[in-house]
Amino acid sequence: MRNQTKKLPLKKSPGSVSSSQVSRRDFIKTTSLAAGALAFGVPALLRGQNLNSKLNIACIGIGGKGRSDTDACADENIVALCDVDTASEAYATQTKKYPGAKFYKDFRQMLDQMGSQIDAVTISTPDHMHAIVASAAMKMHKAVFCQKPLTQTVYEARYLRKMAKEKKIVTQMGNQGSAADGLRRAVETIQDGLIGQVSQVHVWTNRPVWPQAMDRPLGEDPVPKTLDWDLWLGPAPMRPYKGRRNPDDENAIYEPFVWRGWQDFGTGALGDMACHTVNMPFRALDLGYPTEIEAIPFGQMNKESYPVGSKIRFQFPARKASIPLEHPHLFHHHRTIEHDAVTLWWYDGGQPDPAARGGHDLSNKPPIELTADIVALQGEVPESGCLLIGDGGTVFSPDDYGASFFVKLKGEEKFRHFTKHPALAQYPERIPRNPYGKSSGLAHAQEWLNAIKQNKPELCYSRFDITARLAEIMLLGCVSLRVGQKIEWDGPKMVAKNCPQAAPFIKRENRSGWALS
C-alpha cells in the first residue's frame, strides 16, 4: 500500500413579488440574456471588486436546514430570500434578521429580476426541487450550495455534475461532515493502507424520524393563502393539497419536513442520511459505479412512500484510483492504488418482529457478531455509524458524519481513538484541512464562499464533481426499493440491465413546464 505496485485496499411584502405563473418562455429568455451578460461566467464579485469584497447571496428555501444555510453566509450580503410558504416561523425570523434582502416566493422571478446582482445561491428546498433550482442558477453562472441529497434522481445527479464541470461553477453539497479533520484523516489513512484491503462496509442510521409507509390521504383541503402549492409541487405530478389527515392529527402530511417519506418529493432515510454516513467510506475506498443493488424493505412498500425500514446491499467491483501524494491540487503528483471488490450494507429504520430479524437487533443495525467490539468500546451500538472491515483491521465511526473514528488493527483487542493510535503516525496528512473553524456547518459554507472569491471550484471538498457520484450511488438504492428487485447496473450507460421498469425512477418525467433543459 505504500508504493504504486502494491494493491490497496430590501424586503417587500410577499404578494408584491410572488407568482408561480412566470412563463417558461419568459424565464428561459431572461435567464439566457442574464447568462450572456456575464463575462465568461465569472461571478460579479470577480469582475469588478477585490477579493475582500462581500458576495451577494440569494437563499432559496429558508426554513429547516435553510435557516442555518442562510445564517452561515451572514457575513456576506444576503440580498434575496425565497420560500414558497410565508406562514412559517422561519419566514418571520429570517426576513426580520435580513431586512435588506428582497423576498420572493418564486425562485424564477428572483433570478429573473435580480440575476445581475447575485453571485451565489443556497438551495434548501425539498429534494424534488434541488436539480430544477440548481440548474437554473448554474445556467446563469451562479455559484451553488445545495443541500443533500444533491438530487432526487440518478439522471439529475449526472446532469448537475456535467453542468458544473463544463461551466466551471463553484459548487458544494451540504454534507458538512466533509469539513471535519477526522473525516479527512480517515480518508487518507484508509487509502494509504491503515486497515489493508477493505471487503465490507456497514452503515446504519436511526432514520426515518418522520412518517413513512403511508398511503396518500383521501380528500382535499383549501390551500393556505400563505402557501404556493403549485410552486411547492414543482416538477412532481399535481395532487390535491391536504394539511392533516383529520383535525385532531398534530402531524402535517406534506410540509414542512415530512415530505421526506413521499416518493414524489423525498428520498426516504437512505437519501436523507447516506450522503452523510456513507461519505467517508465512499471517499476512502474510491467507490465508483456499483454493479448490483438489492434492497429489502421492512413492512409495507407501496407506490406512494418509502418503507419504515430497509436493508440494502451495494456490490462494487475491484477498481483502481489515482490519489495525490501530498496535496489534492498538485495534479502532477499522484500515485495509483488498487482496491478489491467491496460489499456495502445499508440499514435504516427498524424491524419490530423478532422472529424476522435474523442476526440483527431490533433497531436494524449490523449483525451482532460484527458489533461486539463496538459494544465493548462504548456500551452499545450507536443509533448511527459506519464500520469498515479490512484484512488488516477495522475502522468504526460512531456518528452521522464520519467526523471521528476508532481503529482496531489485526491482532489488537480493542478499538482506540484515531488520535491515540500509534499506527497513524506513519501516514502523512496529505488532504488539506478546512481552516475555517470548529463548527463543521460554518466551516463547510466558508470553504465554498472562499472558493467563490478565488474562482477555484477545486477548493470545495464536496463539489458536485465528487458528491454527484455519491448521490447517484445512494439513489440507486431508492430505485431498487421502488422496483422491488435486485438491479444489475450499467453505470456508463445509466441503465438497469435486468430491470427496464426502473427507467422512470432513474430519469423521471417531470410535470409540464418543469423539464431540465
Question: Where are each of the predicted segments found?
Answer:
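N-terminal secretory signal peptides and thylakoid transit peptides that target proteins
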Residues: 12-35
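C-terminal helical cap and adjacent loop that interface with cofactors, partners, or active-site loops
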Residues: 30-38, 245, 253, 265-285, ...
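N-terminal Rossmann-like dinucleotide-binding module
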Residues: 31-98, 177-180, 281
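Predominantly a Rossmann-like dinucleotide-binding segment in NAD(P)-dependent oxidoreductases
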Residues: 61-65, 69, 167-172, 177-295, ...
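Conserved SAM-binding strand-loop segment of SAM-dependent methyltransferases
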Residues: 102-106
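Short amphipathic alpha-helix with an adjacent loop that forms part of the alpha/beta core around
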Residues: 109-116
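N-terminal Rossmann-like NAD(P) cofactor-binding module of classical short-chain dehydrogenase/reductase
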Residues: 121-122
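Beta-strand-loop-alpha-helix segment that lines the small-molecule cofactor/substrate pocket
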Residues: 126-127, 131-179, 193
